[in-house]
Amino acid sequence: MEQPSSKALFTPAKTQRASEAIYNQIYPKIISGELRPGDRLPPERELAEMFQRSRPVVREALRMLQQEGLIETAVGSSGGAVIRGVS
């Protein structure tokens, strides 16, 4: 599974509720197809650094995406968030 370059993928979250701001950056990339089914998001730690927010805030944004069926998450060494795609 291909992992997009994490350097320019997202910008720091600075407005609204931080988890919503993160969600609002990831969601359109999934809907537009920029992030394709099978792509992996960077690990939580990297996402937290990119968005300049804590891991729990990132986790909440990922939970919102998961509830919509856009990503799957797993724990452990082969875990992380994987794009499911748009149904």
What are these regions (language model features)?
Residues M1-S87:
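Short linear motifs at protein or domain termini
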